[in-house]
Amino acid sequence: MGKISDLNYSQHITLADNFKQKNEALDTWYVGMNDFARIAGGQNSRSNILSPRAFLEFLAKIFTLGYVDFSKRSNEAGRNMMAHIEFSSYSKDTDGNEKMKFYMNNPEGERADLSKVKIEITLASASTKGIREGHTVIIFKQSDGSTNRYEGKSFERKDDSSLHLITNKVLACYQREANKKIARLLNNHQKLNNIQELNDSQELNNSQKLNNSQELNNSQVSCKGSVDSTITDLLEKALNKG
């Protein structure tokens, strides 16, 4: 376990073509983030997702902890951001340094001239006094072909858990909460339309089936504690090793 680095954000924002603090590219991000905030229901924690920098802070926090309780209202905005991730890839170089890439739709919308946003999370193999350093960054292209890169906050790990294992844990926590939401929506839909009468045991069974399909029951994954080594092989289909 480690603590989030106290480095100032302003020290990590770098230029990747023609960066300006309030340029049009950043404005489109704000528009996209506000859309996601509305999806999240206008909760008090809207500030969690109103900028690329804030989303990177959320990622740094959960990768420092190695888990996330997505059922908490304070993590709702981050959970809705995670929902926009389309696919991912994982790589490890000869020195043991790890890199996880998440690809998500451009907040400006689905357009042929806009590539997907890439979120990179890296974790060094070498440690200093038992501490390994990780880093987060968001990269996306504008319609004119220029590339914007936003450096996020660094994070630290004081154990030897692989980035792949930590990512599996985070995604497992996300999927389990998503399954609960789906189960609730299905049950509400069935009740409102009187399609089928469900007693308590049937509702519980349906919810359990959803969880079992993803192999994410409580005995395998704890989203309120440190990394659980039993979930190493979970969600392999969701992570395409590169």
Curated annotation (Swiss-Prot):
Domain of life: Bacteria
Keywords: Secreted
Keyword Secreted listed: yes
Compartment annotation: Secreted
Keyword Secreted in record: yes
GO CC annotation, single: extracellular region
Inducers of expression: Member of the type 3 secretion system (T3SS) regulon. Expressed at low levels and only when the T3SS is active, in a MxiE-dependent manner. Expression requires MxiE, IgpC and a MxiE box.
Chain's role: May contribute to pathogenesis, although some of its characteristics suggest it is a fossil gene.
Name of protein: Invasion chromosome antigen R
Organism: Shigella flexneri serotype 5a (strain M90T)
